[in-house]
């Protein structure tokens, strides 16, 4: 939840207004078939049953997945066996020094069944989050009809508006390094409950989804030992991006309180026409509170 900040501005707790999301509704054969049909056929090294077989033998597997999903949603419990990721480091581009870990991008592989369950949840969770007044209207990531183009248009519009008013434009790009890896679970879950009205078994499902996750690294034929993750929204997941957007939603309130224009795409924020001496300390203070 939002906290009090030092300096000239005070940020208060945002509360949810509307109908709570207390349970994920049961899914049908048709729901699962639609999800499977839209999923890419790229195999996962963690799959006991490859995605191509799930698709080609849907008449056999759909009923099993429906039963698994509905039992999971009813109990508010994300299956533990689908919470392990295999991470493969990929060199960001050819020619980079392969001995430096910073030159690699971690590619996280999750099981196909995990992604099926996540997509079934996303169908219900996304409209609930986006329909809340607490979800930033200036976030172009993860929203239907929005993209990097809408983010760029918003930034350009702020520049042109300033030019029309004969004002100088200053644009600041704020990027969070390894942001998905440092999300504090207690803050995220509290924000979902208090600010977005996710409660009861729906919140329990999301709690078990993001907590007690594991991963290991594989390079060639060698695999590391498995490590337990304590602060993360899953890389390579379906739900990770929208959960991260909810986690960082208060950024908009902080920026708007200074009377400036801003726009976001995923974990990138762009600020224009701002009062730097007061805005940046508040922004950095909030970031420190969320990621330490």
Regions found by a protein language model. Give the residues of each.
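Mobile genetic element proteins and their domesticated derivatives, centered on retroelements
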Residues: 1, 32, 36, 45, ...
